[in-house]
Amino acid sequence: MIKHLVIWRLKDEAAGNDRATNSRLIKEKLKALRGQIPGLVKLEVGIEGDSNNPEQGHVVLYSVFESRVALQAYSSHPAHKVVAAFIKEVASERRVIDYEVFAAESPSRAPR
């Protein structure tokens, strides 16, 4: 399993909307990808209130894929590309991390 996390900070205004509206639109557009992309096991989207803290993101994506191949297929999927183009227009920053989780790993064995 591959976990894919992305955090965005958004522009105050973009695409004719304020930041709060664009946050909601991103959430809706990402959630609409559920069931469209093979290998996408889980997708959650969170939006932050109205923080001006420069260290805090505005939108976070947490997703799980069956494999790296599935993650690559997601990246090139036409439905994802449409959402990504919108996000690129309204985001000012993006941070991403992808990491592999093995079945043998469990919360009780997590490093401290």
What do these predicted regions represent?
Residues R68-I97:
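C-terminal structural segments of small proteins and small subunits
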Residues M1-G57, E66-A73, Y99-R112:
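Short S/T/G/P-rich N-terminal loop/turn motif that feeds into the first structured element of a domain
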